[in-house]
Amino acid sequence: LTSSNPSEAKRAMAAVSGSTVNALGTAQRDALRDQMGWIRNRTTLMGVNPAYVNDDLPRFHMWMEGTGSYAQLDTRGDESGYRLTTWGGTVGMDADLSDRVTVGAAFTASYGDLTASAADSADGHLDSYYASLFGRYQNKRWAHTLILTGGWNDAKLNRTVNYGEGSYSTQGSTSGWGLGAMYELTYDIYLDENRSSVLQPLFNASVVTTRMDGYEETGAGNAGLNVGRQDWTTGTVALGGRWMGLIGSNIFGREALGEIRVNAAQDLGDRRGETNVTLLGNPGFTQSVRGAKAGTTALQLGAGLSVPVGTKGTVFVNGNADIRDGSSSVNGSVGYRYDF
């Protein structure tokens, strides 16, 4: 902090002030958005075939999937980004109540490794547990989907601060929660007479709000930080399209279904994390620490394949990507669905 080089002194001050602490709240927000996307991917294949008489309703279904993801936000100077790698699983149930209405619920556990590097460096974990309720209403060619998700997070962040010839390390643990809602509207445009290929223009709107509780660091005495609460609220609107088509059948006459998705999305609301911190040795002085900004306009890509197994089972795989200025993410899932 006493360096004669102003840029070195500024970077040292940023390190002492915890330039990486915003990684927790930013990663928490992005993980919740990924979770709602996974549930959305499942709902697109729900509902009954309107070409048949469905006189045995309600019908019940259950599915399980394993998920994995990698997300990163680029660091910009002393404004930290993050890297988060997650793996987890979901168990879901849904019921076709009528020719038009499907409802369901899903429960997810996800475990993540988190790293960040700016003026200081950090590593830790972000574990998340989600419950989702969803519904889908299909009326002729129009379909409406609503997803509500609540989550609880357990997090840990260990920082290392280098100064001159020395360094010190801190440890911090906290928890948080998040709520999200997503609505999607689609319209079916059949591309052949058999309705085996369909193009769906779509509109999607979502909002998430997250909170990571404040905490006190340990391990470095008075050099540790009291880290304030981290809050995010971000809305997203997207326009795009989805193609779905039958691409073969098994010996029982059940057909595999392929899917491709392309969206252009725009974020509204919070663009970066910002947290108040105080040194434990100087509690009267509070400083605001800012994280790196992510781009607000995104290209979202996705693909999926559902392959029938026997007369009542289906194996499915899905992949998604979100690409924007300064950040990107990819995720995938593989699972099994059973029709009772």
Question: In which residue ranges do the predicted regions lie?
Answer:
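Short, structured loop/turn "capping" segments at alpha-beta junctions
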Residues: 193-200, 210-214, 249-256
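Outer membrane beta-barrel translocator domains of Type V secretion systems
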Residues: 1-194, 316-340
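Solvent-exposed flexible segments
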Residues: 144, 151, 185, 197-212
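Solvent-exposed, glycine/polar-rich loop segments of beta-barrel outer-membrane systems
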Residues: 1, 76-85, 117-124, 154-175, ...
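Outer membrane beta-barrel transmembrane domains
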Residues: 225-340
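Short, internal active-site loops enriched in acidic
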Residues: 68-69, 110-111, 205-208, 262-267
